[in-house]
Amino acid sequence: MTLLLAGDIGGTKTILRLVEVSNSSELHNIYEESYQSGDFPDLVPMVQQFLVKANIPSHPEKACFAIAGPVVNNTAKLTNLVWFLDTERLAQELSIPFISLINDFAAVGYGIFGLSKQDLFTLQAGKHQTEAPIAIIGAGTGLGQGFLIKQGNQYQVFPSEGGHADFAPRNELEFQLLKYLLDKHDIQRVSVERVVSGQGVVAIYQFLRDRKLAIESPEIAQVVRTWEQQAGQAEKTVDPGAAIGKAAVQGSDRLSEQTLQLFIDAYGAEAGNLALKLLPYGGLYIAGGIAPKVLPLIENSNFLLNFSQKGRMRPLLEEIPVHIILNPQVGLIGAALCAARL
């Protein structure tokens, strides 16, 4: 058995986990802790404190850290922290011979292979093809996209910046939304991430509200107004995207319901755009924090219709398996699996 250290490092919270891996690549969780990232000047003292508290007689041989941000030449700088991470320095200061830094969405790609059936909700069974490409898309704070290609006997994960591609409206309401965002932000283009993400949920709500296309409820209106008043502040006391999503699932706010309907339509369409580019008959996996929370709405929506509504290509997309990832720790699982490969 080999002892591994896996980490999911965010600007706010970091989760560290010790894992043992057998020759069959089966993972066994040993110890886990969560930390507030800002409480530490660097990752090294956090890991050192973690290992002392874990009180494990052996020392990790390999480590992989999933980073909320780009990784360039084995280095990473987190957006909301002063940390600058370098694999060579980390290996030396932590006495761990093999260390890797990967983008957090790449970690999701690796994590797919550590999920059980209970960790997935299948929207479309499709016709799975062994060794075919796999696609991942995930709306959360932003919109992540990536893909996996089989090379030899293993899949290699390739993150992308597809979430920053142009938002492509398909009907009059979406064209109005595009115009609204262009005017509001005084910009020349709108990325799909401005619509299909947590910030997109709020933007759609504001659009429908300002165009008086639905009536606000006092409860959600107060949350959104508070958030708008706190614009520019580092710390916000409310999460309007979460409040809107919850109200939509509960059916307690008509404007929130319409917001999620437009959001899910756009989400399905963008997932279909990604699928067209790759034809991922190995599966298209929907990650991110939003989909599991609004699963009842997605299940009973036109997500799949918008996913497959691509003209003459529709029959191809109807054969692609589509799954929603329910396990919020898929990135941590992926970091452990990535460490096992080192």
Curated annotation (Swiss-Prot):
NCBIfam families registered for this protein in UniProt: glk (TIGR00749), PRK00292.1-2 (NF001415)
Originating species: Trichormus variabilis (strain ATCC 29413 / PCC 7937) (Anabaena variabilis)
Official protein name in the record: Glucokinase
InterPro entries hit by this protein: ATPase_NBD, Glucokinase
Cellular compartments annotated: Cytoplasm
Class of enzymatic activity (EC top level): transferase
PANTHER family in the cross-refs: GLUCOKINASE
Gene: glk
Organism ancestry: Bacteria, Bacillati, Cyanobacteriota, Cyanophyceae, Nostocales
Gene Ontology molecular function, alphabetical: ATP binding; D-glucose binding; glucokinase activity
Gene Ontology CC annotation, any one: cytoplasm
